[in-house]
Amino acid sequence: MSFLSISRLAPRLLSSKNAACVVVAARNASASTNLKDVLSDLVPKEQSRIKNFKQQYGKTSIGQITVDMVYGGMRGVKGLVYETSVLDPDEGIRFRGYSIPECQQLLPKAPGGEEPLPEGLFWLLVTGQVPTEEQVSWLSKEWAKRAALPSHVVTMLDNFPTNLHPMSQFSAAITALNSESSFARAYSEGVNKAKYWEFVYEDSMDLIAKLPCVAAKIYRNLYREGSSIGAIDSNLDWSHNFTNMLGYTEPQFTELMRLYLTIHSDHEGGNVSAHTSHLVGSALSDPYLSFSAAMNGLAGPLHGLANQEVLVWLTALQKELGGEVSDEKMRDYIWNTLKSGRVVPGYGHAVLRKTDPRYTCQREFALKHLPNDPMFKLVAQLYKIVPNVLLEQGKAKNPWPNVDAHSGVLLQYYGMTEMNYYTVLFGVSRALGVLAQLVWSRALGFPLERPKSMSTDGLMALVGAKSG
């Protein structure tokens, strides 16, 4: 049985008597602390497995496409292979087969901490294996070693106008980091395509290492009068270094950041940012260009700005209704929002049909660390009322809260009130998932993405409809 097969079986067995054995098997799948060495062992096995699968089932149909799907943003079309995570409508996201609660239980934590380290999740996403503390420690130190920014990127960030949106700065700086691309250099020198993944791995590791420095510099320049981000401490984990560079020293905020960066990392391959990185990467654009393109998608109001919209709506609600709000007044406000043609931000999801587990774990964090915060109480009250109102309205396929309904409130509580910046945090996190997949896309030799497009007249002719 392959290591990746073990990771797929483990979650189904965690509740059984064999749970301990499976967890031990997954944890001990590889003793090496060097991620590239582990990958070098996994890649040929996965290549062989997929080759055999395609030989046997390559011509097998996996579904039908309707006209509504074509006009509806390709919702429900099974058209991508994405290995690192799968989104179940009822269970929510699973990272390499593991649910968020399982990741919280199994992934290594910082000394004295309770939330999983994002390094551990990245190892899991790349390998399918639950890492050891030693493997996570190696990754923390490796990213610290690779974190320094080239001088031209620092100069660029320092000279951006203050009215340029943080996401525009983030994307531009990532594009400029392409000067450091090992993959672009190797490709120009004619490297064998069997080795593409090795250089994509190096670029991805470098980029993930540098993103907190880029993000922190943007934050300091815009909101802290350009003060220094300080130096990376190789003895600290990735999230701890990030919060230090941002200027936040509260241990609970660092714990929140570990949780935030873990749960926002990946959400299967069809969302805008993940699909964009896959699409651009399929042209053999290097990871810097691919990820920068993904961030331009994440900056869109329909993708990464939702948590900001939640806070704007909550603030307006507080301003209109005052402090303590009765359930009846809350219901009336929600109905007024809906009747005006607007939606309740933070509720509903394109795929999910239950409460987003990413919302649930943030709610649990808030119940433990800030149960009396007025804004959290408001969010908790909405959780009790909004789903019933949406069900009563009868339009929503999913009346339950998603991840965005909670994250902004937590950040505000610890003093990060700059809402325009929140999507940058989302972007730092999303790198873990899409870059883990990008490495595998090159390792598995995925081709240039080129779906067939059709005109409306062509579709009408295809289904036998009259044009006009």
UniProtKB/Swiss-Prot annotation:
- Taxonomically, the superkingdom here is Eukaryota
Please tell me whether the keyword Mitochondrion is annotated for this protein. yes
Name this polypeptide is given: Citrate synthase, mitochondrial
* Pathway membership: Carbohydrate metabolism; tricarboxylic acid cycle; isocitrate from oxaloacetate: step 1/2
Q: Give the quaternary structure.
A: Homodimer.
Its predominant location is mitochondrion
What is noted besides the main data?
A: Citrate synthase is found in nearly all cells capable of oxidative metabolism.
EC annotation from Swiss-Prot or TrEMBL: 2.3.3.1
Instruction: Tell me which residues bind oxaloacetate.
Output: R358, R430, R450
List the Gene Ontology MF annotations in alphabetical order: citrate (Si)-synthase activity; identical protein binding
